[in-house]
């Protein structure tokens, strides 16, 4: 009797692939022998498009990469441009950027855990967590005018100061959010079915995690406490007191726990940001980067011309190259910029954490059932906006 393997196409229209992922599965019965991901179905040429835009016009492209956590990607680009310009950022703007980066982390992890539970067959966590995500999206809308594609961070600060009472409302949200998170933990942490589907599934050793270039919860779930907010702090993260949660076994369950614990740490950071939030400007005082105020434009024709030229022609960035990375919710999100002295980047290279994580899907899936592949895809926390770019 001969063993005959079958080939199964999973996706790209399958809801559990979290985007336009096409998987070619080679299977022996229900056991996966090989998983070959086919990517590129959402490729939009983002890096090339950025080369034809000014530095200000390039920011909205970063919202549309990992569209689940947009502000963290804006943060990386803003840091890279600031590095080339050697410009300082007002302290209030730094606190606002850290505050919204951590709100974005909660926004990302709530979706990941909710959709992961839904993939396995639990509907309640998704409904509860979407209720909390809606509140964060309202904060996005109040500060930027948009629920998702915020276009809020700027080289040299942020677009606008916080509206009145926003900090009070964020504080109310983070006071009640731990109890909601505790409800999710009570539902899932010791749930027999949840643990049967996650424990010892998709195990990644510390060596494998390093060899495959994993970062974020995928790396920390394997027990490696590497977090750019600690190892290479940016803005005011060096003033924040927080822990880096790590797992022990490197399986899907540990990665779930790491994301839960990260949300508690994000709450701690947000509380510190609100308590320490200084008064002052939210944009650099460099007139080359900052548009004139409406009052000045009503009084001065030069201010009006300056405003017009800033948004149509942008500003020149000195010749040089830089790489800046942030600890995005999915891992290390990096931006390499090369400037030839003009008002547009000569080259912009984007390093997306999900790209490296997806490459590890094959070795994580081997020997598991097809139903476990769905669990592994969910724990990778992939979004094809950033993978295909």
Swiss-Prot record:
The keyword Transport applies. It comes from Rickettsia typhi (strain ATCC VR-144 / Wilmington). NDH-1 shuttles electrons from NADH, via FMN and iron-sulfur (Fe-S) centers, to quinones in the respiratory chain. The immediate electron acceptor for the enzyme in this species is believed to be ubiquinone. Couples the redox reaction to proton translocation (for every two electrons transferred, four hydrogen ions are translocated across the cytoplasmic membrane), and thus conserves the redox energy in a proton gradient. GO terms for cellular component: plasma membrane. SUPFAM superfamilies: HydB/Nqo4-like. Keywords: Cell inner membrane, Cell membrane, Membrane, NAD, Quinone, Translocase, Transport, Ubiquinone. Belongs to the complex I 49 kDa subunit family. It is a peripheral membrane protein. NDH-1 is composed of 14 different subunits. Subunits NuoB, C, D, E, F, and G constitute the peripheral sector of the complex. Its main location: membrane. It is an enzyme of class 7 (translocase). It catalyses: a quinone + NADH + 5 H(+)(in) = a quinol + NAD(+) + 4 H(+)(out). It is found in: Cell inner membrane. One of its GO terms (molecular function) is quinone binding. This is NADH-quinone oxidoreductase subunit D. The lineage of its organism: Bacteria, Pseudomonadati, Pseudomonadota, Alphaproteobacteria, Rickettsiales. Its EC number is 7.1.1.-.
